[in-house]
A protein has these predicted regions:
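A translation/RNA-centric and nucleic-acid-associated enzymatic feature enriched
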Residues: 44-213
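TRNA-binding/sensing appendages of the translation machinery
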Residues: 1-39
Length: 213
């Protein structure tokens, strides 16, 4: 995590820290209402708040003000825990760490090349030799560009570009690129592990070594 943070700061990004508790209203701005497929995966604390299932809504909230206060392009990132009632399996966890980076206010025609640069920057800093970009359908963004690597082509992160319809509730109209990486998945592929449990937050493992030996 510290290596990725240092690389982003060295490349002009500013780290932000937003609350772990998120309001229902902010999720609704991302089109996640009671009928959305992701809603059933959310850990609701009460009728109005939940443990954040993603970082994006809070980053939108911060960006709408930074676009007014800072010169463009605005470059920020956040590293933080997210929570979802994910399907079981070696590559899923109910608590996981996301790294989201956003560059907003860049030239429209440079978005794709910049996205490639930023994906390579993080993947290489994580110690992963090669990766691919694949276009995938998304229940939130409509379409994303997934970064995959390793045996079995593990999804390391998902990227999107704007302007995007989800920008409208925030009155944002700037071109942007953003990527959300799963830190545990980056570590899993970098270390050649087959299980997220060995590299994530755990009571059973320390630095990938089982404690019940």
């Amino acid at each position: 995590e510290s290596r990725l943070t240092d690389v982003l700061v060295d490349n002009g990004f500013v780290q932000v820290a937003t609350p772990t508790i998120m309001s229902r209203g902010l999720l609704a701005r991302m089109s996640i209402d009671a009928n959305h497929p992701l809603s059933s995966q959310v850990f609701w604390l009460d009728d109005k708040t939940c443990l954040r299932p993603m970082l994006a809504p809070h980053l939108y909230y911060v960006l709408k003000d930074l676009l007014r206060l800072w010169e463009k392009p605005v470059r920020i990132f956040e590293v933080g825990s997210c929570f979802r009632k994910e399907s079981s399996g070696a590559r899923h966890s109910t608590e996981f760490t996301m790294l989201n980076l956003v560059e907003m206010g860049l030239e429209l025609e440079s978005r794709e090349s910049r996205l490639n640069e930023l994906a390579a920057l993080i993947v290489e800093a994580a110690g992963i030799d090669e990766h691919e970009l694949q276009t995938e359908e998304s229940t939130i963004y409509g379409q994303t560009i997934d970064i995959v690597a390793g045996e079995g082509r593990v999804e390391l992160g998902s990227a999107a570009m704007g302007p995007h319809p989800l920008d409208q509730p925030w009155r944002i109209a700037e071109p942007w690129v953003g990527i959300g990486f799963g830190l545990e998945r980056l570590l899993m592929v970098a270390e050649g592990s087959e299980s997220l449990g060995r590299v994530g937050r755990s009571l059973a493992y320390l630095n990938g070594v089982p404690l019940n030996i």
